[in-house]
Amino acid sequence: TKTADVIRDVSTDKSQIGILYLNEFNEKVLTKLFRDAGLEFTELFSCGAYAYVWKNHPLANREEISIQDLQEYPCLAFEQGNSNSFYFAEEIFSTYDYKRVIKACDRATMLNLMVGLNGYTLCSGIICEELNGSDYRAIPLEQKERMHIGYVMRKNEIMSPICRKY
């Protein structure tokens, strides 16, 4: 889901919550957008960034990896539609000058490109094998930028029981 869509869906009551991340680069802009939309951000946890690769990627056996190590491989990023501001990018390091970037709209395409092209994406390191299978690895990045994972809700809204369970 596109970041701008998450903000719009929560602010218009289409969704009760939206899961997003803040980092040093996007925090001021997104916090202002949350405020303007009547939303508040609640941090769940913070974490470092990871490179997400196919298990047979040439770098898959590394214990840690740098952005420079990944230069020769295509970076896979989620398409952000008309809201293509760097601040809306779902991937951390959105301003880094990657040699090759391929944009996709869905997880299945992303996973296929990881296998077919030895591509990678950047993520929080939280991997759900039930969704993605066991053929992928998350490798910590040497860069120590923090991601603050959390949710946005409309201000003063009480979380529903189903939302709380989620």
What role is predicted for each listed range?
Residues G18-L22, C105, L122-S124:
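Short beta-strand and adjacent tight-turn residues that come in two discontinuous sequence segments
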Residues E27, I67, Q71-Y96, S160-P161:
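Secondary-structure junction motif
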Residues N56-I65, Q143-E145, N156-C163:
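Short helix-loop capping/hinge motifs at secondary-structure junctions, enriched
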Residues R35-T42, S46-G48, A108-I158:
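Beta-alpha-beta core module
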Residues T1-K2, A77-F78, Y96-R107:
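Short beta-strand-to-loop elements that line the ligand-binding cleft
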